[in-house]
């Protein structure tokens, strides 16, 4: 198997003691396009998906003989320069942006992951989170024992590395990765949108529930797959369709093929419409911007208030604020200036960084808000850190009243499918009434959109959405014995699905290795 390069030439470093295996809410991209500069297309593709993860980025390419993975910690623009992109030759590429939601944010856990097969190499990127990683890891150990290969051998502790090991470990001489994938994918439980590749073929797969988005696009000389349609737009690909839940796409010199490894039971994540996806993306044919604007209109109908201005928490709250202003007749204004060079506070690994980031990220326009009664519209309240600091800043800037309006219901339940609220203890709405949350924030009033109002704004049938973070009804079984952030998750009321006895991707023991690769080269041969 080939080496994996990082920007500083190092191959590995030790994880901090006590760190747990992370989950991912990430962006994935893939391209098959002979004659195109696939590394640059992928660079632009994952740049368009930067909002989905800002801790690490990586690209893998194949020229038909060998696979090279180049990845490092940091933003896409920090990881890759012209020299790095020029070194990534080939006609197939996959790319990935990542953030960790529990535990280590380290180079070993950056993606794409790389692993040996019987006849070459597989590279893989993953958006989502698996709920049966312990069972899958047992299968890996049955195959390899303590001789863990690929990213697991280098110290990775992600469910992604486990899937990569399963794909590689189940191949025998002459096997097609396509056929092996059809055996492995049904074993995976949880949420996953995958892009992976061997030396000759690009693959894309989506779990049977379609929790995380994944779309297919057509290039002039090939194909592209991405987490969001906006990434297809950026690289000049024409949207073809969504990858169906339970579908595996295979793209090679023979064209595009489709196989189904599971019966589709769609439950797309509603939080994609609320916050995660770009507003210029479409999910299930629905404009995210239009859905958010309609959420704002519904919010104004459900929670009217006398005020002078409607201002958004930029930029994720802007479409809903516009909708609120349109429906209420209250003038819309930009009362807050956002520093675009500060990452999303929701997608930062520790509360300390989040708190500092809020002050760096937003600054009030005093001349706009002084003496005004404000409606401040935001997309969600998770921990409450942003809104609490924001209310304080607005009052210090002279706001007469601050009325907070939220275009999603209270987040009361942890997400086990790849979003960064892993325990109920982290959620401000858990155990508190709306009035108690209002008092905690220091706002004059607080209004959340209803569950019905939010769902209706998406125009997607309720039964095709996952609303577990709002309702506690989980569409995918959470395996007993799993944990969230090292602690058992709370029990979940009977909702027709298996109760949660605690869930999270369990930590895979990381065995860090020493060594260095001064230049990003590969052999393409199995270990």
Residues of each region from the PLM?
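Conserved short alpha-helical segments that host acidic/polar catalytic motifs at enzyme active sites
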Residues: 2-245, 250-307, 313, 401, ...
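Flexible loop/turn segments at secondary-structure boundaries
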Residues: 38, 101-102, 132, 203, ...
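Generic beta-strand/beta-sheet core signal
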Residues: 125, 197, 205-206, 217, ...
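Secondary-structure transition/capping motifs at alpha-helix termini
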Residues: 146-147, 173, 304-308, 326-333, ...
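A conserved beta-strand->alpha-helix junction
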Residues: 153-164, 332-343, 440-458
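PRPP-dependent phosphoribosyltransferase catalytic core
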Residues: 185, 200-201, 236-242, 392-527
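Phosphate/diphosphate-binding loops
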Residues: 231, 238, 246, 302-303, ...
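Short, glycine/charge-rich flexible loops or terminal/linker lids adjacent to PRPP-binding catalytic cores
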Residues: 329-374, 385, 412-422
């Amino acid at each position: 198997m080939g080496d994996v390069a990082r920007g500083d030439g190092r191959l590995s470093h030790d994880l901090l003691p006590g760190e747990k295996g992370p989950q991912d809410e990430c962006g994935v991209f893939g391209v098959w396009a002979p004659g195109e500069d696939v590394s640059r297309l992928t660079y632009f593709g994952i740049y368009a998906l930067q909002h989905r993860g800002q801790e690490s980025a990586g690209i893998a390419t194949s020229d038909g003989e060998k696979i090279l993975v180049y990845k490092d910690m940091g933003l896409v623009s920090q990881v890759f320069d012209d020299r790095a992109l020029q070194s990534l030759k080939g006609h197939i590429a996959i790319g990935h942006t990542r953030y960790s939601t529990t535990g280590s944010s380290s180079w070993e856990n950056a993606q794409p992951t790389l692993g040996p097969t019987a006849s070459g190499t597989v590279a893989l990127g993953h958006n989502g989170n698996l709920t049966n990683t312990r069972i899958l890891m047992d299968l890996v150990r049955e195959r390899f024992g303590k001789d863990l290969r690929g990213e697991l051998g280098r110290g990775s502790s992600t469910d992604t590395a486990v899937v990569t090991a399963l794909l590689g470990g189940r191949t025998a001489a002459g096997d097609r990765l396509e056929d092996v994938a059809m055996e492995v994918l049904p074993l995976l439980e949880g949420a996953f949108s995958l892009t992976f590749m061997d030396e000759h073929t690009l693959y894309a797969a989506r779990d049977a529930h379609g929790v995380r988005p994944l779309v297919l696009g057509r290039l002039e000389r090939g194909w592209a797959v991405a987490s969001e349609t906006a990434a297809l737009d950026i690289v000049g690909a024409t949207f073809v369709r969504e990858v169906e839940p339970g579908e595996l796409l295979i793209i090679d010199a023979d064209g595009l093929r489709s196989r189904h490894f599971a019966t589709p039971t769609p439950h797309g994540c509603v939080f994609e419409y609320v916050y995660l996806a770009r507003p210029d993306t479409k999910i299930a044919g629905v404009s995210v911007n239009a859905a958010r604007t309609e959420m704002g209109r519904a919010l104004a109908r459900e929670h009217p208030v006398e005020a002078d201005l409607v201002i958004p928490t930029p930029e994720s709250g802007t479409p809903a604020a516009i909708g609120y202003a349109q429906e209420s007749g209250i003038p819309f204004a930009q009362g807050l200036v956002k520093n675009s060079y500060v990452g999303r506070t929701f997608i930062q690994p520790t509360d300390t960084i989040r708190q500092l980031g809020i002050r760096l990220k937003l600054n009030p326009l005093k001349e706009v808000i002084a003496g005004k009664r404000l409606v401040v519209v935001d997309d969600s309240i998770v921990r409450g850190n942003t809104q609490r600091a924001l209310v304080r800043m607005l009052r210090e800037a002279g706001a007469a009243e601050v009325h907070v309006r939220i275009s999603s219901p209270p987040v009361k339940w942890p997400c086990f499918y790849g979003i960064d609220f892993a325990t109920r203890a982290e959620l401000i709405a858990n155990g508190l009434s709306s009035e108690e949350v209002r008092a905690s924030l220091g706002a004059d009033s607080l209004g959340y959109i209803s569950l019905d109002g939010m769902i209706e704004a998406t125009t997607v049938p309720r039964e095709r959405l996952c609303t577990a973070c709002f309702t506690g009804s989980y569409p995918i079984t959470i395996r007993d014995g799993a944990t969230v952030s090292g602690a058992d998750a709370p029990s979940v009321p009977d909702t027709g699905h298996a109760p949660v006895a605690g869930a999270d991707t369990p930590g895979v023991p990381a065995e860090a290795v020493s060594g260095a690769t001064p230049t990003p080269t590969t052999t393409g041969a199995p270990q």
